[in-house]
């Protein structure tokens, strides 16, 4: 009986030891696993950081590249729109000049007419001369007058086989002596263009054939006399009249009716 009790106690102690050992083992293993997991997680974060930074930089670069390409595309489109807009404005200006030339051509008594495009005009000599794409081969000749933008702008100074140089009225060294007539009411006074006043942007007319009154606003046209013999081309309007110190001669200043700055097409006119 005593032996049975001892065996029972031994079994209880053994089972208790097993349970305690199992509990301790489970707790220790859980702690190790937790610490090991924390360590692995830390290493993973450290390893992932450079890759995350690289991905972020890569994304930023891709965004910048897209933005740059979009800006370049927009700039190109804007440039193309500006070019087209300039082309349209240029065509409108040229068409208006052509309409004015056709209207004036129908009113002039000229036996020779020739339309030509401006192909060269140097900034250095912008107010002195320009070159046309038509020459002797197309009928251009000296003593022809040049009209554009509704009025007289100059005269032919040199003719080559395929080009013509026009001497502009705004050339301060112009010595072509084109005849003009001033209409004051029913009175017509003839004179000669003797130069250009660049300070006041006016033509100077002298050698008048009459002492008749001349007023500001009187119309001035070509006289049709001398070498340049096409009459009634609009020249401008009288601005003022001044007398010489001895009152024997008068000088008339005239505002040009034609814009000589912006010229694309010109009509050369003359009489054989």
From Swiss-Prot:
Membrane topology: Single-pass membrane protein
TM region positions: 9-29
Coiled coil (residue ranges): 64-112
Record Gene3D superfamilies: Rod shape-determining protein MreC, domain 1, Rod shape-determining protein MreC, domain 2
Residue spans, topological domain Extracellular: 30-272
Keyword Cell membrane listed: yes
Regions of this protein lying in the Cytoplasmic compartment: 1-8
Source organism, top-level taxon: Bacteria
GO biological process terms on file: regulation of cell shape
Disrupted gene: phenotype observed: Cell shape does not change, cells start autolysing earlier. Neither PBP2b (penA) nor rodA can be deleted when this gene is absent.
Compartment list: Cell membrane
Keyword Transmembrane appears in the UniProt entry: yes
InterPro entries named in the record: Cell/Rod_1, Cell/Rod_MreC_2, MreC, MreC_beta-barrel_core
Pfam family, one: MreC
GO cellular component, one term: plasma membrane
Alphabetically ordered keywords of this record: Cell membrane, Cell shape, Coiled coil, Membrane, Transmembrane, Transmembrane helix
Main location as per UniProt: membrane
Function: Involved in formation and maintenance of cell shape, probably part of the elongasome which synthesizes peripheral peptidoglycan (PG).
Domain notes: Deletion of the C-terminus (residues 183-272, CTD) suppresses activating mutations in khpB (also called eloR/jag); the deletion no longer interacts with MreD and interacts less efficiently with PBP1b and StkP, CTD deletion leads to increased phosphorylation of KhpB.
PANTHER family noted in UniProt: CELL SHAPE-DETERMINING PROTEIN MREC (PTHR34138:SF1)
Similarity-based family: Belongs to the MreC family.
Self-association state and partner proteins as the record states: Homodimer. Interacts with a number of proteins in the elongasome, including PBP1a (pbpA), PBP1b, PBP2a, PBP2b (penA), StkP, MltG, MreD and RodZ.
Record's protein name: Cell shape-determining protein MreC
Gene from which the chain derives: mreC
